[in-house]
Amino acid sequence: MAARDYYSRGQNLVYNRPVLVIFAVIGVFLVFDILRQVGTGTMVVTDLMSYLWNGLVLGMSLGLAGVGLSMTYSILNFANFAHGDLITSGAFAGWATAFLIAGLGEFSVESLILIGGPIAVGSNELGINVVNTPLALLAGLLVAAVLTAALSLLLDRIVFKPMRSADGVTLMIASVGVALFLRNFLTYSFLTDSRGLTGGNVPQFTIAGVTFGGHQITLVVVAALLMLGTHILLQYTKIGTAMRAMAANKDLAKVTGIPTERVVKLTWIIGGGLTGCAGFLIALQQGTLTVTMGWDLLLLVFAAVILGGVGSIYGAMVGGVILGIASRLALVWIPASFLLVAAFVIMIVMLLVRPSGLFSGRTTA
């Protein structure tokens, strides 16, 4: 009888959700192919572990960057296309601070805050990394968080608050205008040159043939701590309770006495702070910075958020990690130039199989 029930359920699944079945079969095939390659020696185990580690690093970057985006959507119900340029703004603010502290007293302030531009002090002269200049990096991280939070709050006050009653499409279009303004302001201030950030011997650790970069470890650890802090904030504080209530039903939250406008401000502050931290850490791990860094990442961040479930903060975290690891594992079969394609294929598959994402129905909770 049990076997007949399983057969009946399987038959219903094939008839009702054939797309899910097809992709499940493909997924199982790919997993077995990886195991086959490892078993036959076609692929070395250390290569597989490197793919997983690099995927985790990318995933934590996308997850942390996606938290602020999900916060904005869950409370204000619009896709903020200025989010990528907020990432970049945080990175520039933080790294200008790190350069200033690392070289203060040896070089002029003007040459330091330009962050290694054409007429500025280069990163090799300062030797910035997690071992040589930890205090400069810590100060840069804090400034990136504070200034991006302040910038987010300012943009809300000037642009989004007067449009609070507008629909999501109108707010989204407004955010595109904000993105263009921020990017052009950064271009005017810092030019478009790609600049190196870190110098000296960046520490590396090799375990079982897998290399773990010091800046990669820093990103993963700090991002994990920030995500844990966000979880504690949402689940165990009055602010978090108010945010979850407002995300679930804004009108009901207002009727019950929750100060909705204050919650909106706190959302921008917290989301902006996390976004600034993400920008600073991503630039640290990459070792370079450009005015288009955040814009280039934005589609991947959106993909991570969609994968996890739009408006779900936990979904953004998990979606980022899954997307990062899966896209790096795709290197087993495709060239590196197709990594973006692999990431978006994963997103499209999720939209076909589960349109609401992994954490569907959950917003900030």
Regions found by a protein language model. Give the residues of each.
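Inter-helical junctions in multi-pass inner-membrane proteins, predominant
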Residues: 39-54, 233-238, 264-308, 329, ...
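Hydrophobic alpha-helical transmembrane segments of polytopic membrane proteins
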Residues: 64-69, 147-150, 299-324, 345-351, ...
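Pore- or pathway-lining transmembrane helices of multi-pass membrane proteins that form conduits
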Residues: 84-89, 155-156, 160-189, 293-306, ...
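Alpha-helical transmembrane segments within multi-pass membrane transporters and channels
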Residues: 103-178, 318-323
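Membrane-interfacial amphipathic/re-entrant helices at transmembrane-helix boundaries
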Residues: 2-64, 79, 107-129, 167-168, ...
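Helix-loop-helix "hairpin" substructures at the membrane interface of multi-pass membrane proteins
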Residues: 213-289, 318
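Cytosolic-side transmembrane-helix boundaries in multi-pass membrane proteins
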Residues: 1-37, 189, 193, 251, ...
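Single transmembrane alpha-helix segments in multi-pass membrane proteins
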Residues: 47-106, 158, 163-165, 309-313
